[in-house]
Amino acid sequence: MKRSSRVRVGATVAVSALSLALITGCGGDSGSGDSKDSAGKGSSPTAVAKALSAAELGKRIISEQDLDGYEVKSADKGGKFAESKDQVTVVDAKCEPLAYVLTGFAPGDESAYVNRMATEKVAEPTSKGTSEESLDDIEDSLKDIVGSTMTIVSLSSYDGGGAEQTMKSVSDAVAGCASGFTVSAKGQDTQKFTKVAEEKSSGSGDESVAFSVTGKTEGDTTTVHAEVVRHGSTVATYYSVSLAALAGKKDKYGIPAEIIKTQAAKLG
């Protein structure tokens, strides 16, 4: 294959992978069990918890100033899988919390909700020409793009014991949806996931649960990673996808530890 052809193919793969990642991972801002992986503080009840407002959550969610090497913006800047949870259909109801995390919504019946998309910064190609050296530069940049990881971070708040109930529903879903589930929405292709597996969580917050979800992307098997963490009456979710994995390449990755650590620090 000619060098120029390889660059065009690389660009197509990068754009296609990014488009799919945005479709499966973006929502917006809303005003409306074995947790903690056997580590940390456990799931003790929150005393008369009061939900934070969307404005308060907005002050506490990560920003670009908090994370070196990442571009951070509202996840609403990308495409939406659906306009609201009501438009998301999950074949097995008990798997709904997982589907909500993967489609950019809060996993429970939240009072307020905000989200952000954190993407590793990749240097743009400096060359514009068609010489061998210029094409090498462009191709290297495309490899960096395809090898990068994108993470959707959300914060949702709950009144009373809603945050604890949400964590239990996520834990129950991870245990009960091991064989996968199907999610669809009006105007979107049906997403079929074939496997859900519990993973070791970060141990952040008052309780946390991590899991991976495997599905098919244009014939290739793709695995994405997620974690849900409770900080008092606020629940943080993290959903990471490797563009290399979406492009059908084997790529071992997880949720960037610095993102979870930074978000936990902002929640106190």
Give, region by region, the residue ranges found by the protein language model:
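A small/polar (G/S/T-enriched), proline-flanked helix-loop surface module common
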Residues: 73-74, 79-221
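Short, low-complexity, Pro/Ser/Thr/Gly-rich segments in the mature regions of secreted, periplasmic
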Residues: 256-267
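N-terminal low-complexity, Pro/Thr/Ser-rich intrinsically disordered segments
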Residues: 37-62
